[in-house]
Amino acid sequence: MDLYEHQARELFKEHGIVVPRAEVTDSPERAREIARALGGRAVVKAQVKTGGRGKAGGVRLAADPAEAEEAARHILGMDIRGHTVDTVMLAEPCEIEREFYVSYVLDRASGGFLAIASAEGGTEIEEVAARRPEAVARIPVDPATGVHTATAVRIADAAGLPPQTVDTLVRLWKVLVREDALLVEVNPLVRTAEGRIVALDGKVTLDDNARFRQSRWGETRQEDADSLEARAGAKGLNYVKLDGEVGVIGNGAGLVMSTLDVVAGCGARPANFLDIGGGASARVMADGLSVVLSDPDVRSVLVNVFGGITACDAVADGIVRALDEVRLTKPLVVRLDGNNAARGRALLDARAHPLVEQATTMDGAARRAARLATAASTAGQAG
């Protein structure tokens, strides 16, 4: 589960990481009062669990309380990548001298964690890595030993961070361990004109498998019950939200994982993992497609099924049902092979939906889904 920025900063504060004074509100009038309490000037930030807030106009610097009220009024109710802004956070501005990036993230390949750090913060770390890969340090962290001062010094040296960041690196690791997080990120971590190290923005992703020992977040999970993961879980679906734009549905974890890799190899990013399992019914397929299509980040959907216990005609029937229940506005690429594949293809041909295409191979289906997602993203940016 992802936390909102204001929740992440409260965790940082609890663990001794310096953050600016800030307060959350859903009222423009209250925003004026908060700005006044902060000294007049304030950064007004949309609180949504997605990126791209700044580019969407969801972050504004207000020079006085009146501007803060106006900014809050503008931001509240905005739609940012399909997320409605219900609250804003007003934070005290900082005089920034330098910006850095630091994070700890679970590395599933090694079974440990990675410290990722850069002396070039304040922008998407992927952009920095693509432009100057040598500017991003990746240091493996053994979870058995963790991050103490010596390890933090090594991370800071590798990334070119100043010595003052070492204490924050140690404390950020404590946030990850004590809160059972899969990711803790500060971007930017800044050095102010006064020489203070301050976490201006943060992201924390909690491990849902550890919820039994993190009761403090139970209420937050309840408030977030309309999330895609919660909706999928209520339908008994094995769904994991990812950060891409191509929705992926398959039968069997191995096939779905392979499909994710092929999509990535085609230059796109998977938006999710969704395994409908063996013996899935038409109802399960329809439910899965409904969840994936409701993700605002999804630009195209790839259904990749090898029929065994799960018959391809049942999958096709589920797709047809979903088309009758949900207004399809995103292109759907379907690859069926195996048990009753010919029948399944015939069902989809008979439905003849203009946004549904079929492919005969996994590679071909992934390439087509990736191209459609790229085209949709480009059209959206142009619009």
UniProtKB/Swiss-Prot annotation:
It comes from the Bacteria. Signal peptide: none annotated. Pathway: Carbohydrate metabolism; tricarboxylic acid cycle; succinate from succinyl-CoA (ligase route): step 1/1. Residues 9-231 form the ATP-grasp domain. Mg(2+) binds at N187, D201. One of its GO terms (biological process) is tricarboxylic acid cycle. It catalyses: succinate + ATP + CoA = succinyl-CoA + ADP + phosphate; GTP + succinate + CoA = succinyl-CoA + GDP + phosphate. Substrate binds at N251, G308, I309, T310. Its cofactor is Mg(2+). Its EC number is 6.2.1.5. Belongs to the succinate/malate CoA ligase beta subunit family. Heterotetramer of two alpha and two beta subunits. Succinyl-CoA synthetase functions in the citric acid cycle (TCA), coupling the hydrolysis of succinyl-CoA to the synthesis of either ATP or GTP and thus represents the only step of substrate-level phosphorylation in the TCA. The beta subunit provides nucleotide specificity of the enzyme and binds the substrate succinate, while the binding sites for coenzyme A and phosphate are found in the alpha subunit. This is Succinate--CoA ligase [ADP-forming] subunit beta 2. The gene is sucC2.
